[in-house]
């Protein structure tokens, strides 16, 4: 399909990414994972040493409303990128921030946004080491984040196998309760799952279970069976919202059945675990009509 022959609304986010990156080439001796995972992964100098790169943007009117707390806007900008590191089991190292801002923006508001950034950076030991400012029609922040795995491999989306059980952390569907501004990235949980070699595949739920589980299945080349009754809905959320609203930032991961007892016995975090299905060798996605969309930046909903 020629790019000019289709609109973004029809192509969708996944289609656009494929169109733009289909001809990219990487050096496998240096690059473990590129387009298609939560972060890009480069091989480090030592054995089992990896560097992870992530860039993520928050835009006024898309990721936050004009009247939201500026401290929480800054917090969310970094927390989103941290969640992607968590999804691969990595520890954060440093970040640079690009700020796009209208020339009549309040300096007090900008100062509060950066206070929120600094607070969460301190909490998760992220060094804020630079950035850029640019005039823009509307406020946005872009975070470029560096992480690392030392002594263990990051968890990719592509490692799930038929028979692996599907787990999520926490509860889903709390976007309307402002959890998208207040969530905690599951860094400790993700790193533990990677170090213990328990998760066979993993990602974070940024666009919703309805969009992200099919992505993980496609990356692994298999399908899935969902137990809809087991999906953990946040208080006040419907099943449809839990599946499709997005911005949960919980971990979605798969586990070999032989490791599930170890997972449950050694899981020492307050974050609850929920088994919601199993990866399968047959296509059963068509039996799941509630997997409607998830969030897509471009498709009409």
Segments and roles (model prediction):
Residues 104, 181-248, 280, 289:
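Active-site-proximal betaalpha loop/short-helix elements
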Residues 3, 8, 184, 196, ...:
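Acidic, Ser/Thr/Pro-rich beta/coil linker or hinge segments at domain junctions
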Residues 41, 81, 89, 128, ...:
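Residue-level signal for inorganic ion chemistry
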